[in-house]
Amino acid sequence: FDEHNRLHCLTDRAGFWQPWAESGEGLMPAPSAHADHAPAPWQLGASTWLPMGEQAYLASWTEAGFGHLGIRTADGTIDDFTGEYSRFRSLALDDEFIYCIAASPVYPSAVVRISRTDHRVDVLAGGVAPLPPEHISRPQTLCYPSGGGQAHGFFYPSMQGEIKPPVVVFIHGGPTSACYPMLD
């Protein structure tokens, strides 16, 4: 609920988990990317978006496997706070900062504080990489035919030049989980 006691929720009525809000005409979609704005809804306790009044909201969403973070206003413009991160969870905010658990392909999960004015990121806890970032392979999105549709994944190219490293494949047991482009 927002400060005007209007209900805000996520629904997949349009094919993606997207924000909707109560209005005089019933439940209406909020302006949003054609992308999922939440992980599987049976993973309870997630905070992936927050209403900010007058149809503005803070949200994380996933496009081509990579997470994004931004404030979307009623006119549809987005103030993008994604930076170098690719996964955002447990969103909170105040007048000055956005707080969340964020991770990237080269840094593990960290509690971060992001300035709403200059987008400066402060790591409050965690996020210590076990290797220098230049030694960590970065994921590339990958789509390939599977059954009657498309499967999606990430390819991590070798950081060793011509030396072929072993192939590591992560398969999730969906639909309850997914793979994310983050160091874990």
What are these regions (language model features)?
Residues 1-2, 11-12, 22-47, 72-89, ...:
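Multi-bladed beta-propeller domains
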Residues 3-4, 12-15, 24, 54, ...:
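Short strand-connecting beta-turns/loops that link adjacent beta-strands
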Residues 4, 89-97, 101-184:
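Serine-hydrolase catalytic core recognition
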Residues 6-8, 56-58, 98:
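Hydrophobic beta-strand positions that form the internal "hydrophobic ladder"
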Residues 8-21, 32-43, 60-68, 84-85, ...:
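A flexible loop/linker signature enriched in serine peptidases of the S9 family
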Residues 19, 28-32, 49, 68, ...:
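Secondary-structure boundary/capping motif
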Residues 19-21, 27, 49, 68-71, ...:
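Hydrophobic beta-strand positions in blades of beta-propellers and related beta-sheet-rich domains
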